[in-house]
Amino acid sequence: MNIYNRIPELKSTAIALGCFDGIHIGHQAVIKALRQPDCETLDQAVFSFSDAPAFKKGAELIASYEDKCDILSEMGIEALILPAFDSVRDYSPEAFFRKILIGKLDARLLACGENYRFGKYAAGDSGMLRRLCEEQGIGCVVVPSVLYGDEPVSSSRIRAALGAGDVQTAAKMLGRLFSYRLEVVNGRKLGRRLGTPTINQVFPADFLIPAYGVYASVTEVEGVRYPSVTNIGVKPTVGAEAPLSETWIIGYNGDLYGRFVRVSLVSFMRRECKFPSIDALKQAIHSDSIKSVGLTRDYLK
């Protein structure tokens, strides 16, 4: 997949338009709409912005840039176009359509969600886009909102679910487990002394941190998936303060310091709490491991 930080000149494209910040099942429906009959020869592309206003309102990331690129590539996208918003912010909807989508990107098919807005002051909507496409003689697919629980799927709903620890609902709206691939950093090695060696990972400042607590998780190491127990929070029993992800990979004992490891959250098991002793903590961890093995079984294949 080619990635462009400026608007390139392309030929014969089918383009999905939108925010695509989490690439949830609603975003995926828009991307899949590019697969129209008689459009197989078009190069599939996604057009968004690297710094759109929607990204600047304190909305933490639910998928890293690298993960989004991987997902789009797996979906068959050949070009990801991410110019700075300021480069086109003063274009009217009609000018954006004619100068950018047609003039530079040679769009032959456009797809968007029903709530899509474009152009200066977000004056253009999906209805206008459909009309402009008809006038130009190119295809246009406006995808209805995908519903979950009678309400449209949205990144804000996913963030709310994760903030409440409801990773199962978040996974249904994402179309995949919520996961993060972060560098393993040095910790206090308390887990190793307890017989449950753990990996510590620090969340980036702009990444969403799920509700504090203990999760059944799946951790991937060198292409192998292991059941695991992940604590997200501040480890109150041992007096830690900075929030991080600490994971015991069940059945793996290798050294992962300095490596990037993916952890996927399967199910929330219990709130983070302070135990009266290290022995009580150790017993709780082993109890958590038994639950996690059962909860993650279907995700290890």
Segments and roles (model prediction):
Residues 6-65:
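N-terminal catalytic cores of NTP/NDP-binding nucleotidyl/phosphoryl-transfer enzymes
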Residues 9-12, 87-90, 147-151:
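A short acidic, often aromatic-flanked loop/helix-cap motif at beta-alpha or helix-coil junctions
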Residues 12, 187-301:
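Phosphate/ribose-recognition catalytic cores of enzymes acting on nucleotide-derived substrates
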Residues 24, 72, 110, 170, ...:
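Residue-level signal for inorganic ion chemistry
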Residues 53-136:
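N-terminal Rossmann-like or analogous alpha/beta NTP/dinucleotide-binding catalytic cores
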